[in-house]
Structures are given as C-alpha cells and as structure tokens.
Regions:
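Helix-rich C-terminal or lid/interface subdomains of diverse kinases
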Residues: 129, 255-321
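Conserved NTP-binding catalytic cores of kinases and kinase-like/nucleotidyltransferase enzymes
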Residues: 1-101, 206-207
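Conserved short submotifs of the Hanks-type protein kinase catalytic core
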Residues: 103-114
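Short, glycine/acidic-rich hinge or "gate" loops at secondary-structure transitions
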Residues: 94-98, 145-156, 264-271
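Active-site activation/catalytic loop segments of kinase-like enzymes and analogous catalytic loops
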Residues: 63, 76, 222-263, 284-303
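Active-site acidic catalytic loop and adjacent metal/ATP-binding pocket
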Residues: 27-36, 42, 181-227
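Short acidic/His/Gly/Ser-rich catalytic and metal-binding motifs that mark active-site loops
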Residues: 50-55, 115-117, 223
C-alpha cells in the first residue's frame, strides 16, 4: 500500500518508512505506523477481503457483516466521540478518514508521540491500576450517554450478534440462562458506554506505567460497565491468580470510579452506582463465558475460576427470578 498520497493530504512532505504493527483480524487489512517528516502517525487500513479467513473457522455471512458494522462504528466513534473524551480516558485523535468502495484509511495520532510508548504482555499492579482508571473515567463520563450510531449493545461477544456460538454452546445450564444473563446486564442501572474489547493488548502506557490510553474501538457501544472490567481482568490476570486478585481489581476500579463520578457527574450518587454495578461483575463474566465456551470450548479462559464465577452468576439470577 502506498501511503504517500495520504500523508501529502495531511500536509507532510516526505514519507520515510512504514512499520507493520499488525494485520487486522481475519485478513481485513493492516495497522501501520507511518514515519513522515519528523513524526509518525498510525494508519488503520481496512480492506474487505473477497474470501474470509477466520482463525477459528467462523466464516459466515453474519461474521462478515458484524466486522463491516464494527468498522463503521469505529469510524463514527473517532469522528464524533474521541475529540470529546476526558484526558483521563484518552485515545488517539483522528487526523483523516478516506473511504472508498472496498477500502478505508483511518489516519490517527501515534500514541508514541503523545508519551504512551509501551505495551505490555504481563501487567504489574501499576499497569492494572492505569487501565482500571481509564475504564472508570470512561464509564463515569458516559453514564446515560445515548451512544448515537454506536453499537446498541457494546462488546464483540454480545449474544444478539453471536447466534452461531450460542448454538454451538455445549453447557446446557449456561445456555438455558444465556438470555436472562443478557437481560440482567441490559437492565442494569446507570447504563454507560463500554469500550467493548478492553483487553490488555488494547492499552498503551507511559514509560512509568502510571497512565494508559486505549485503542481499537470497533465494538464500543451502550452497556453495563462490568463487561469491560470482566474482559480486562480475563486478559490481564492469570487464571490461577484471579481468585486472589478479584477483590483488589474491583476495589481499585471502584476507587477510580468514585473520583471520576465526583469530578464529572456531581448529580450522581457514587454509592448508588457502586451498589448497582459491583454485584454484576459475576453476571458480566458469565456473559463472556457463554461466548467463549461456544466459540472455543478448549480456550484457556475457561477455567476453575470462570466456571465458579459463572455458577455464582446463575445462582444470583435464579434467586431473583
């Protein structure tokens, strides 16, 4: 791909080099760092493939349409929401969007140029706290946001967009309760916007690890904040440490949430928000477990901790039925 015309449209004179960061999921393009003049930018090059190449074989028309929708949502998000984000939940600003029939270029700031120079595969407590702070401020500042033209239900595993995986689910108890779990999350008080894919790999950090910024907003939309917290913990805490770390993760998140609500939503009662959200952590994880067990039954994210949490969620739902 020749990125010279794009950088010229942005006012740069010289294209020095490009660096492939990663190919997009399922062969839908690439993420590239472009070095131009004395700086660098990030370009998300979305190219719709003629044949779909899903790593786990879910090559369906529905899967393809979901990805197309996700890129449309992401473009809308960058154009209309990112410029309004609070500094404590920052994301790269869009620089230019070029849409053609089967391709799209999303040029955005390079977080490296803004001081977010690190990504990590293993998070220390400082990294964990930085991500939880980002999520808390993101959730607090978007409580009751209508999420115009975003996903009606955020997250890439939402049940309405995953009928194939639900059909493949071999856990009869979880399958029976799947829609009740979803309805419980949809009915949660203080609905907000969720990132939708808040895994550790989608956060970049300052060199000291104290601040995080997030990327990859294909599945941003309305929902219960605990969905993001559960997905994040599933990606950032080893299964054998989850039981021990759960209380710390939740306390850290809610500590940041208190500060964020007090600062940005003075008309809301923090204690009411926490009272409504904290019990939904296990429900949100059970919702994710429903997807993973249908999608990839031998996945490492299915383990004793997640099974116990799912059981806890189903028991809670049955008590309230």
């Amino acid at each position: 791909m020749d990125y010279l015309p794009l950088i010229q449209q942005l006012g740069y004179k010289e294209l020095h080099s490009t660096q492939l960061i990663q190919s997009l999921w399922g062969g839908y393009g690439e993420l590239v760092r472009v070095f131009a003049d004395k700086t660098s930018i990030i370009v998300k090059h979305i190219a719709l493939p003629e044949t779909q190449n899903h790593p786990r074989g879910w090559n369906t028309t529905l899967s393809h349409q979901r990805k197309i929708n996700s890129y449309q949502v992401e473009l809308h998000w960058y154009q209309n929401f990112v410029p309004l984000l609070h500094k404590n939940c920052s994301a790269p600003l869009p620089l230019k969007i070029v849409e053609q029939e089967h391709t799209c270029l999303l040029a955005m700031q390079d977080l490296h140029q803004l001081g977010y120079v690190d990504t990590v595969k293993e998070a220390n407590p400082m990294h964990l706290s930085a991500c939880l702070k980002w999520l808390a401020w993101f959730h607090a500042t978007h409580i009751q946001n209508p999420g115009d033209k975003l996903w009606e239900s955020g997250t890439y595993w939402h049940i309405e967009t995953r009928p194939d995986e639900l059909e493949a689910l071999l856990d009869p108890v979880l399958k029976k309760h799947a829609k009740q779990i979803d309805l419980k999350l949809k009915g949660a008080p203080f609905q907000t916007l969720v990132h939708g894919d808040a895994k550790l790999a989608n956060f970049c950090f300052t060199a000291d690890g104290k601040q995080a910024a997030a990327v990859d907003f294909q599945y941003v939309g309305k929902g219960c904040a605990m969905k993001d917290v559960a997905l994040f913990m599933s990606s950032a805490v080893a299964p054998q440490q989850c039981t021990e770390k759960e209380q710390w993760i939740l306390d850290t998140y809610f500590g940041h949430l208190r500060e964020a609500i007090d600062s940005t939503q003075p008309k809301l009662s923090y204690s009411e928000v926490e009272k409504a959200w904290r019990p939904l952590f296990c429900i949100a994880w059970a919702d994710f477990q429903r997807f993973v067990k249908g999608w990839s039954p031998s996945h490492w994210k299915i383990n004793d901790y997640t099974e116990a949490l799912t059981k806890q969620a189903i028991e809670a739902i049955n008590k309230q039925a």
